[in-house]
Amino acid sequence: MLMMLKDILKTLAFSLIPAFIFAFLVILAMPLFQKNGIKKVFKIFFEDIKENKENLYLLFFLMYIFIVFYKTVLQRDFIYSPLENVFGGWKIFMTQYTGLDYQVIGNILMFIPFSLFFCLMKKTQSVKYLLLLSVLFSFLYSLLIELNQLIFSKGTFQLSDIVYNTLGGLIGALIYLAVKLIINKIKEKGAK
């Protein structure tokens, strides 16, 4: 568990600044730099983030997407046979002595924030629609990661990763909906 925590902290330390830069450039787009200059673009960017929560959520979402991609594809070493274990990785318990498989737990946990940020960005009242979109986008992003691992031989393509990542996305959406429900009930009590 300590090793997993160290690995997470190392990933965050090495990818946080590039993730911020990636998200910043995606939100503002390069033409703004050419038209207004860097100093003015930075000023506009931070003023917009202060005024608009949705853009702040988008910033965090894009940064998180980059961090996950960095960890799962870019940071990996070259693997000669990425299809070696396509159907592996389903066991939650490694053996009766070693306990939980941290890779399985990590795959689930990795996509909980993905769905939380995604849900924060969506302005929809339909619970079913939000759940469906969260699961769909978690599945698609996980598939994108696995295909990149396969194409660039950076990690092994595993169907279990897609399933566990999608499950994490579902859990993230359910957490968001539960917190939203609690907040709404508190607001209703306060209004009475």
Whereabouts are the PLM-identified features?
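Bulky hydrophobic segments
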Residues: 1-153, 159, 173-192
